[in-house]
A protein has these predicted regions:
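Residues that flank catalytic or metal-binding motifs in active/ligand-binding sites
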Residues: 17, 31-33, 46, 62-64, ...
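Histidine-centered active-site/metal-ligand motif
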Residues: 10, 57-63, 70, 99-100, ...
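Short, small-residue-biased leader/transition segments that mark boundaries at the very start
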Residues: 6-21
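CBM-like, beta-strand-rich accessory domains located in the C-terminal region of large
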Residues: 84-390
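Extracellular polysaccharide-recognition and catalytic grooves
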Residues: 1, 19-63, 74
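Short, P/G- and charge-enriched loop/turn segments at secondary-structure junctions
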Residues: 8-9, 23-25, 53, 88-90
Length: 390
């Protein structure tokens, strides 16, 4: 029944009203590691789908991979599939290289997992859907634990931008690369990549750990991400297609990756969000300005498992929090302290001066929206919750 719903929309004459059957725009199928988030159930709406679960046989080596449908096109796509007896299935389509994942020293999940399975599976957690703000966490550490001790991928969808935050740590120093399988015309413009297919268009904008090198003269930008074009078989096996790898030149064993995927309303849209990279003591983040709204996004560098027996408190821009990540939105021309819209990921408190905006006995995932005297909350994290809000 589930697969019928996923593949084919039931006719409106079915027993259940269409609007009732598809009431939720987000769904987490935690047992087998799927999550879907969409902005509506209208035709050609935008959908983000994330996978992080078991690997074996039909379930590919794609922990933490994702696809995006936008205006009827899988604009960020999966590498595909082919007839099982063909060597391309086991050599490419099944493997991590055919999916939108992070590789370390050129390696993804061990290739033998196709036949022996992944002893440690991937997981998806903490799905939140508050309309224009959605979130899910993918933990793909287990399937790549031969190289990684942390392989977390956060998806934070705010308005018309999907922010993908990678929290990565490996057992040894080496090189990281991000894979992108696109379905459309690929055009690099400065630090952005535009992908367009008919009326569907997105911008891929890497922001951390580095920007994309601004020009093709990558030797002028030795610390920035450089790109590689890789040829792979098409799904029909009649030719080849190109996918892309963004390489970090530095050899490290811990990195935070932050990529913005901007969902354009039309291919010619020029009014795109302005994003300013910002950093402070023990945090990195962004200030996003668009359509009269400012959003400040903070990522806590102390809350990634590096501390033991100490709290991960940071004080960015006058805020005080132990949250792994938080965002605050407010109208342009006003002050952040008067904000009413918050996103908090794995935090127990948010304070500013003598004011407590949020306090909990356990760390939670929270979206808060306030208007007039109405307060809307979406909370995930503990079976029993004891918390207060301003």
């Amino acid at each position: 029944f589930f697969f019928f719903l996923m593949i084919r929309r039931p006719p409106r004459s079915t027993l259940f009203p269409y609007t009732t059957l598809f009431r939720s725009t987000s769904q987490l199928f935690s047992d087998f590691g799927w999550a879907t988030m969409r902005n509506s159930w209208e035709k050609d709406a935008t959908m983000l789908a994330v996978k992080s679960g078991h690997t074996w046989n039909h379930s590919h080596a794609d922990a933490n991979s994702f696809i995006i449908f936008h205006k009827g096109v899988d604009i960020i796509k999966d590498g595909g599939n082919c007839w099982y007896p063909n060597p391309a299935y086991r050599n490419y389509f099944f493997q991590s290289q055919a999916h939108n994942v992070v590789l370390f020293n050129g390696e993804g999940q061990p290739r033998e997992q196709q036949y022996s399975g992944s002893t440690l599976r991937g997981y998806l957690y903490h799905l939140l859907d508050a309309g224009n703000v959605k979130y899910v966490l993918a933990n793909g550490t287990g399937p790549v634990s031969n190289n990684f001790s942390r392989n977390f991928r956060h998806f934070l969808w705010m308005d018309d931008v999907i922010y993908m935050i990678d929290d990565l740590k490996t057992h040894k120093v080496g090189r990281f690369e991000w894979l992108w399988h696109t379905n459309g015309t690929y055009k690099k413009s400065g630090v952005d990549v535009n992908v367009t297919n008919g009326n569907s268009s997105v911008v891929i904008r890497p922001l951390y750990p580095r920007l994309l090198a601004k020009s093709d003269f990558v030797h002028d930008y030795p610390e920035d991400l450089y790109w590689e074009e890789i040829q792979a078989p098409t799904e029909d096996l009649k030719g080849t297609e190109t996918y892309y790898s963004f390489h970090l030149p530095a050899e490290v064993n811990r990195v935070k990756g932050l990529t913005a995927i901007i969902l354009k309303d039309t291919p010619d849209e020029k009014d795109l969000p302005q994003m300013e990279r910002r950093e402070g003591q023990d945090w990195i983040g962004l200030r996003i300005r668009h359509k009269g709204k400012v959003t400040d996004l903070y990522i806590n560098q102390l809350a990634d498992g590096r501390l033991m027996h100490s709290n991960s408190w940071i004080m960015p821009d006058g805020w005080m929090t132990d949250a792994y990540m938080f965002a605050v939105s407010y109208p342009e021309g006003t002050e952040a302290k008067n904000a009413k819209d918050f996103f908090i990921a794995y935090g127990s408190a948010l304070r500013r001066g003598n004011e407590t905006y949020f306090s909990s006995l356990a760390k939670l995932f929270v979206i808060q929206k306030a208007e007039d005297k109405k307060l809307d909350l979406w909370i995930n994290g503990q079976p029993k919750i004891n918390t207060t809000f301003r």
